[in-house]
Amino acid sequence: MAAPYSPVMARLGDIVFDAAHPASLARFWAAALDGYAVAPYDEAELARLRANGVADPEDDPSVLVEPAVPGPPRLFFTLVPEPKTVKNRVHLDLRAADPDAEAARLVRLGATQLARLDGWVTLADPEGNEFDVLPVQ
């Protein structure tokens, strides 16, 4: 059970991914995670992009993926100039009723399977960020 909100302690807000191609990586994670979608581009957002010299949302340097319900963290995908070069120091653990079937679905979406261990599967997203798929607890 979660502790009540404390104005003194920090809370997890957003998870931010550095990305070479924020829009395509955002689409991968929106499809990968239950209850998440790429935030829509309304007129105000399109105007913000144009004001920053971005004509096409596909070239947006910072793409938001939102949960369908309040509570879970939002995901931001931010353009960075350098490629990923080493293993993640932090990774996400996804939970699924059937980790092998879920890993196969994620591979069809563009992930790469890195390892199959006892009870879980390690994958990398299309830009090489490692994550695990484990059984539901």
What are these regions (language model features)?
Residues 11, 59-61, 88:
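Residues that flank catalytic or metal-binding motifs in active/ligand-binding sites
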Residues 29, 127-130:
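Short, glycine-anchored, charge-dense loop/turn motifs used at functional sites
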Residues 73-78, 132:
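Conserved beta-strand in the GNAT
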Residues 133-137:
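Short beta->alpha transition motifs characteristic of CBS
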